[in-house]
UniProtKB/Swiss-Prot annotation:
Keyword entries, A-Z: Amino-acid biosynthesis, Aromatic amino acid biosynthesis, Lyase, Pyridoxal phosphate, Tryptophan biosynthesis
Annotated source species: Parasynechococcus marenigrum (strain WH8102)
Family: Belongs to the TrpB family.
Function text: The beta subunit is responsible for the synthesis of L-tryptophan from indole and L-serine.
Modified residues (N6-(pyridoxal phosphate)lysine): K111
Signal peptide: none
Presence of the UniProt keyword Transport in the record: no
EC number of the protein: 4.2.1.20
Catalytic activity entry: (1S,2R)-1-C-(indol-3-yl)glycerol 3-phosphate + L-serine = D-glyceraldehyde 3-phosphate + L-tryptophan + H2O
Pathway entry: Amino-acid biosynthesis; L-tryptophan biosynthesis; L-tryptophan from chorismate: step 5/5
Coiled coil segments of this chain: none
Assembly behavior: Tetramer of two alpha and two beta chains.
Descriptive protein name: Tryptophan synthase beta chain
Length: 418
């Protein structure tokens, strides 16, 4: 494997109480904050206030829960991957593998949990125009979907390279009535799309709400996006108790910006006997410099309004990221992930493009589930994790999205092998 995981130390429980994460000024330890133009500060304050009021409004939570159930299709199942479990079984036993099936949500990924919640907040704030960034296209599709549902104008910023890789999702967004704005600056991927979305927001802040798609960006976004995705972990806690009578030993998820992982991890952070493992994209290999292993290789810096770990050169300039997965092709990561790594509560590793492709094929053939390339990175870590776990261990992987969108990319890479 590309990297090894450090031993997780037990953090001070007092530092992990939900009420203090984030703390003052949107900080997770030294990470987070609000590094934005002054013109955006009123909008961020308005959003934070609207979210606080909404969570305390029974009508809001009732509407959100009703839509999550009847529109999104929650709760998503916790599925026992019997053949994948058997594949990794040793002579002396091994772990049992479970999948939290976020791929079964409406639109095919976890992204709609957050898009739906933020759309409801936009309506409360009287905003009629929505913008968003997208990499793999799943957040763009989810945002376009909820905008269609509520009759909101929708503009999606997407890197031109990602539009090429994810042409199917581009068509889906346009079919849903969204304008997809190509971004050709820089590497024409997620970082550049995010930068363009922020520029739009600065210009149109009075009429526009920015539905940021990950647990990144300025406060309150890392907290807001996490809280809308926490339904993943909340359901998983209950489902684990029903399935095997206790909490799992390991939770695992892929990490780009980190929203699906944080949604799964958050309700378990205080349960220090549950290991939290995030898996990043090592691209062509960390040693090559062509990767997106931000936590594994990054240093603290500021990008898109927050301090977090970033891929940087010796001059402190943000480096280009690379991954076969458009959703992981980002040189930063959510500040709470950086914090959980720094205090030793969560562990992070990285797998290469080839390892992810191998895992995608393995899961497809063994379970009849074609995972997204992003999700396949988490599956690939099983190769390193399973030999280290005692018999009877329970492992839950967040199956964050389905792989329909990636079939063309996978066909280019594996077509002659099938």
């Amino acid at each position: 494997m590309t990297s090894t995981l450090p031993n997780a130390s037990t953090p001070d429980p007092a530092s992990l109480q939900p009420s203090v994460r984030p703390g003052a000024h949107g900080r997770f330890g030294r990470f987070g904050g609000q590094y934005v133009p002054e013109t955006l500060m009123p909008a961020l304050a308005e959003l934070e206030q609207a979210a606080a009021q909404a969570w305390n409004d029974p009508a809001f939570t009732a509407e959100l829960n009703q839509l999550l159930k009847n529109y999104v299709g929650r709760a998503t199942p916790l599925y026992e991957a019997e053949r994948l479990t058997a594949h990794y079984r040793r002579a002396d036993g091994g772990p049992r593998i479970w999948l939290k099936r976020e791929d079964l949500n409406h639109t095919g990924a976890h992204k709609i949990n957050n898009a739906l919640g933020q759309a409801l907040l936009a309506l409360r704030m009287g905003k009629k125009r929505i913008i968003a960034e997208t990499g793999a296209g799943q957040h763009g599709v989810a945002t376009a979907t909820v905008c269609a549902r509520f009759g909101l104008e929708c503009v999606i910023y997407m890197g031109a390279e990602d539009m090429r890789r994810q042409a199917l999702n581009v068509f889906r967004m346009r079919l849903l009535g969204a304008t997809v704005q190509p971004v050709t600056a820089g590497t024409a991927t997620l970082k550049d799309a995010t930068s363009e979305a922020i520029r739009d927001w600065v210009t149109n802040v009075e009429s526009t709400h920015y539905i940021l798609g990950s647990v990144a960006g300025p406060h309150p976004y890392p907290m807001l996006v996490r809280d809308f995705h926490a339904v993943i972990g909340q359901e998983a806690r209950q489902q684990c108790r029903e399935a095997f009578g206790r909490l799992p030993d390991v939770l695992m998820a892929c990490v780009g910006g980190g929203s699906n992982a944080m949604g799964l991890f958050h309700p378990f952070v205080e349960c220090t006997n549950v290991r939290l493992i995030g898996v990043e994209a090592a691209g062509d290999g960390v040693a090559t410099g062509r990767h997106a292993a931000t936590i594994t290789e990054g240093r603290a810096g500021v990008l898109h309004g927050a301090m977090s770990l970033l891929l940087q050169d010796s001059d402190g300039q943000v480096q280009e990221a690379h991954s076969i997965s458009a959703g992981l092709d980002y040189p930063g990561v959510g500040p709470e992930h950086s914090y959980l790594r720094e205090i030793g509560r969560a562990e992070y590793g990285a797998v290469t493009d080839q390892q992810a492709l191998g895992a995608l094929r393995l899961v497809s053939e063994l379970e009849g589930i074609i995972p997204a390339l992003e999700t396949a990175h988490a599956f690939a870590w099983l190769e390193q994790l399973c030999p280290t776990l005692p018999d009877g261990s329970e492992v839950v992987i967040n199956c964050s999205g389905r792989g329909d969108k990636d079939v063309n990319t996978v066909a280019e890479k594996l077509g002659d092998q099938l």
